[in-house]
Regions:
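Short, intrinsically disordered or compositionally biased N-terminal tails of bacterial proteins
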Residues: 2, 28-30
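Short, low-complexity, charge-dense intrinsically disordered segments
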Residues: 13, 19-22
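Non-transmembrane, aqueous-exposed alpha-helical and coiled segments at domain scale
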Residues: 20, 30-326
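Intrinsic disorder/low-complexity segments, especially N-terminal tails and targeting/processing regions
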Residues: 6-8, 17, 31
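Extreme N-terminal basic, low-complexity initiation segments
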Residues: 1-11
């Protein structure tokens, strides 16, 4: 293998390493030792975020709009049908006039996924924040971030910082997920550390309690993301990541897929309906992500996604490739 000087990577100051990479250092520069590698630049990540924000603020994803239209066909003469008519017409006007779907243009969640042998510059977070600030200013989107949750609730004035995660995954390539998350849907969400003895029944009961108590405040019909497992800090990420999956797409795990359908049927059987004004469709879909956990724990997170489920995924092409050999 060949030691590749980091200074060659568009002057990147730091690099995050995939599994199998090794690190060496001399007095001048860090080196990354890998068989092969691909580079994605911070400029490409920032561009993806900058271009996605105004688009998803004004245009519902096709799968979400199609699900609203299907729900309207199935609704019948209910007050929920009126809600769906308004949501569909609102989406049409927003896309046509390029104005926000909702006055709450949300906080920005960015999730960068990098596959095996991908090199990512460490200061990408600063570039993402700059892209968010420019996008919100130029598109005249509402700024909704305060400086400190407890001690200084002054608006930052540019909707930064974005809430950015970086993950290395087994899937090849790199992609950026962008989501605009309104306050109402997150406020209706929940994280619970159940005892293992609660089991499947306890998980179901907690989900249904959250739905009955909180769903009306989350602007339904909803997409419900459910995370089960991992740890206290990671289970919420599982639930939010579940919202990235298109409406109608079931989990690749047949057990999780069956549970998704079971929970979707149970949630819609409440009769709360669109806008919680009565009807057939309280949820457009339920997505479940599971993970291992400690033997003494059963972490559960429920993340509500509102009817304005604003998200996009952008595949990134590597800026260059390299191969080593020592």
């Amino acid at each position: 293998m060949l030691a590749i000087a980091i200074s060659r990577f568009r002057n990147a100051k730091t690099v995050r390493f995939t599994q199998g990479a090794t690190l060496a250092r001399d007095e001048r520069v860090y080196y990354c030792v890998m068989d092969t590698f691909e580079i994605i630049t911070k400029e490409d990540v920032a561009r993806a975020v900058y271009e996605a924000i105004p688009r998803i603020a004004c245009e519902l994803p096709g799968d979400v709009l199609a699900a609203l239209e299907e729900a309207r066909k199935a609704e019948g003469p209910t007050r929920g049908a009126f809600v769906l008519d308004q949501l569909i017409e609102n989406a049409r006007i927003a896309a046509c006039d390029q104005v926000p779907i909702c006055q709450d243009t949300g906080t920005v969640w960015v999730c960068l996924e990098a596959g095996p042998d991908m090199l990512v510059p460490g200061d990408v977070f600063a570039f993402v924040n700059d892209a968010v600030a420019r996008a919100y200013d130029e598109a005249r989107l509402r700024k909704s971030v305060v400086r400190d949750a407890l001690f200084d609730r002054a608006n930052t004035g540019d909707n930064t910082p974005a809430f950015t995660d970086m993950h290395f995954v087994d899937r090849p390539g790199a992609r950026v997920h962008v989501m605009l998350k309104g306050g109402g849907s997150d406020n209706a969400s929940r994280v619970v550390m159940l005892a293992p003895g609660a089991g499947r029944e306890g998980v179901v009961n907690e989900i249904m309690d959250c739905v009955r108590v909180k769903a009306a405040n989350a602007c339904p019909p909803l997409v419900v993301g459910i995370g089960v497992g991992s740890t206290f800090d990671k289970v919420a990420h599982l639930a939010k990541s579940a919202l990235l999956r298109p409406v109608g797409e079931r989990s690749s795990d047949p057990r999780a897929a069956a549970f998704e359908q079971e929970m979707l049927d149970a949630i819609n059987a409440t009769g709360m309906g669109p806008g919680a004004l009565g009807g057939r469709t309280l949820a457009l879909d339920v997505h479940v992500e599971t993970a291992p956990c400690h033997i003494a724990a059963l972490p559960l997170a429920i993340n509500m996604g509102c009817s304005a489920m604003r998200r996009a995924t952008v595949e990134l092409a590597p800026a260059s490739k390299g191969r080593g050999g020592r």
